[in-house]
A protein has these predicted regions:
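Generic detector of short, aliphatic-rich beta-strand segments that form the cores of beta-sheets
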Residues: 1-2, 161
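Conserved AdoMet/S-adenosylmethionine-binding subsite of the radical SAM
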Residues: 3-128, 133-140
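Binuclear metal-ion centers of metallo-dependent hydrolases, dominated by the metallo-beta-lactamase
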Residues: 143-164
């Protein structure tokens, strides 16, 4: 089914049965280059888009995007087109995956990610870490204190940030 139709049907059901309810959509943001996807996401109350790293190599390790032309820059440029009407959600983690070190909590990673958050200017940021078992036992949950320190840096940009 066409994604826009799913969103339209959801909004119609909400309007008919629970008009006060908010509709939220969490997207991995890899299809933001598609006009229909952007239009559909603009129509919901809470458009939550993933951005787990400022670097293509790290994003590929964490998210395994299937498109060979995937780039963080392309995703960020599309996010900027929402003019702040979005929430950015980021999962912080570290460990080893597929014999490669992955860690989006280093100063280099966090500083670059913060620069992108400053460019995007979302209405809110959500940061979290692993909360359940993963298929890869070598990945580690980031302590809440570290997540809170990252959130404080986001808030210094004038953007509200929640820690889960």
């Amino acid at each position: 089914m066409y994604k826009r139709q799913i969103i339209d049907d959801t909004l119609s059901l909400r309007d008919a049965h629970c008009p006060g309810a908010k509709v939220s959509v969490l997207s991995n943001a890899t299809q933001l280059h598609r006009d229909g996807v952007r239009r559909a996401l603009r129509s919901v109350d809470n458009n939550i888009l993933k951005l787990d790293s400022a670097f293509d190599a790290t994003a590929r390790l964490i998210n395994n995007p299937q498109s060979p032309v995937y780039s963080v820059r392309r995703v960020v440029d599309q996010m900027k087109g929402f003019d702040g009407h979005l929430t950015v959600q980021t999962m912080f983690l570290r460990g080893e995956f597929d014999r490669q070190r992955v860690d989006n909590t280093t100063e280099e990673e966090v500083a670059a990610w913060l620069r992108l958050i400053g460019e995007i200017r979302p209405r809110q940021v959500m940061v979290y870490s692993l909360d359940r078992d993963t298929p890869c036992r070598t990945l580690e949950k980031v302590p809440r204190e570290e997540l809170q320190a990252i959130a404080t840096r986001v808030e210094a940009l004038g953007i509200p940030c929640s820690v889960a």
